[in-house]
Amino acid sequence: MATKLQDENTPCLAATPSEPRPTVLVFDSGVGGLSVYDEIRRLLPDLHYIYAFDNVAFPYGEKSETFIVERVVEIVTAVQQRYPLSLAVIACNTASTVSLPALREKFAFPVVGVVPAIKPAARLTANGVVGLLATRATVKRPYTHELIARFANECQIAMLGSAELVELAEAKLHGDSVSLEELRRILRPWLRMPEPPDTVVLGCTHFPLLRDELLQVLPEGTRLVDSGAAIARRTAWLLEHEAPDAKSTDANIAYCMAMTPGAEQLLPVLQRYGFETLEKLAV
């Protein structure tokens, strides 16, 4: 089912382009991937974008690795059957750390993953204390600890895993206000440190959506670092050098896995991001 919001307050969107454009899929378990998509679109505004989010299995942070791999491969396959893809971005840290090998083995187009921006954070920190704010799953993954050992072994890494922040980010996009008191409670382990992190890695794509609120709660001068801009640059390079010639003249489209009231409430948000319609993807 395709759903279109016909509302006088809906931002006007450009007509369907007549020139074929490379087709890029951005996928996440929820709406956090919109933060990555926004960075890519800023650098590459003239692509055909598909945004898919798994509102049936959200959040992925509490799911098994086997489930995540099978689910992500299934969803990307379903999108690929509808649109030949030039490139896919797995805009979910949890899914990226476990599903990229299976996706790259199955598909001929490039697949870009999202990993915590530990390397740039280690370069930016002045006091040597770097905070990693992520889901509990990302905090526990061996891959995360390998990144720390490789790029930040001279830093003190304060890791904080939270599923509640993911829910707060989703609620914010649905129009709910974010409780700063709740944020203070979640971040209390850092706020009580004698020397808190001066640089914080936003290790979940949902967390840039809470950037303003986090800056109000964290100590003044704290730097927030995420992977969005780096992913956009990587996407641009791959589209130029390695992506297949899969192009479309269709308008941007978003897919959910179930057309729930919550998904329908996201229509105004998705349209502001440039997605003309929202459809249920059969998987």
From Swiss-Prot:
Binding site for substrate: D28, S29, Y60, G61, N93, T94, T205, H206
GO MF annotation terms: glutamate racemase activity
PROSITE patterns: ASP_GLU_RACEMASE_1, ASP_GLU_RACEMASE_2
SUPFAM superfamilies per record: Aspartate/glutamate racemase
InterPro entries on file: Asp/Glu/hydantoin_racemase, Asp/Glu_race, Asp/Glu_racemase_AS_1, Asp/Glu_racemase_AS_2, Glu_race
UniProt EC number: 5.1.1.3
GO terms, biological process: cell wall organization; peptidoglycan biosynthetic process; regulation of cell shape
Enzyme class of the recorded protein, top EC level: isomerase
Key words, A-Z: Cell shape, Cell wall biogenesis/degradation, Isomerase, Peptidoglycan synthesis
Residues at the catalytic site: C92 (proton donor/acceptor), C204 (proton donor/acceptor)
Reaction catalyzed: L-glutamate = D-glutamate
NCBIfam families, per the entry: glut_race, PRK00865.1-1
UniProt similarity note: Belongs to the aspartate/glutamate racemases family.
Protein name listed in UniProt: Glutamate racemase
Organism: Salmonella paratyphi A (strain AKU_12601)
Gene: murI
